[in-house]
Curated annotation (Swiss-Prot):
The UniProt record lists the keyword Cytoplasm: yes
Reactions catalysed, as given in the entry: (S)-lactate + NAD(+) = pyruvate + NADH + H(+)
Residue ranges the record marks as coiled coil: none
Identification of the protein by name: L-lactate dehydrogenase 1
Species of the source: Staphylococcus aureus (strain COL)
Amino acid sequence: MNKFKGNKVVLIGNGAVGSSYAFSLVNQSIVDELVIIDLDTEKVRGDVMDLKHATPYSPTTVRVKAGEYSDCHDADLVVICAGAAQKPGETRLDLVSKNLKIFKSIVGEVMASKFDGIFLVATNPVDILAYATWKFSGLPKERVIGSGTILDSARFRLLLSEAFDVAPRSVDAQIIGEHGDTELPVWSHANIAGQPLKTLLEQRPEGKAQIEQIFVQTRDAAYDIIQAKGATYYGVAMGLARITEAIFRNEDAVLTVSALLEGEYEEEDVYIGVPAVINRNGIRNVVEIPLNDEEQSKFAHSAKTLKDIMAEAEELK
């Protein structure tokens, strides 16, 4: 009988994002056991072998195996990276509908295993699919997390760090809202060591143009990467690994994830990217940044965009 007990992750979806996330977990020894599920069982078999061969060089031993939905019964975390990609000529609503059907099946299979852990959702549109996972699973909102704007915030901090020649970790700045075109930067609270970044940028000759350029580069980064190499996966995989680390180490770390709002930011019944405290129980609480009027208006527009799409989705009615 296998009596092994440690932090266990089940990864559902072994595409570019999923496999990159799996490598990040093994590379950093964030988990004790990793189970991978995908329809392409032969690719899973190959990746499991490849990852196992990497474990002698990871900080601690990580057990990696191919699995099935029954393996979710004692998992601490189920991470969903599976889903359909948007095809040429396909509308966003078409993609939403297709992925909602996929998620209904996946979440149903996971819950049938008697799973009682935390869901982490990465598939796009992530805010809508995190909401769907919460609805389909019946789990408390604290135990369903979307990757949200964790990658957008990382891109934002990177560009700001380059503008000021400091380490990205020294920049305190967030992108909130939909993980998509309606996201927004919280300039009113962005700072380095307490110094407001927008004020510092505005003091430069080309500062105002640079402010707009930094946000546009942040928002449109995915399009540039997709044009160059077909997809984005390393950045989001590292973001997922960071969320996983915060959960398993019970960090109470503040990360910009997709969380359910129940009055915070003047919004209700929507999963959307906001700062939240992450620990072993999932989302401890949403952190409410005092937004200025312009930011609040943009955030409301972002939330409405998500709600309008969900209102048209038959699978959520």
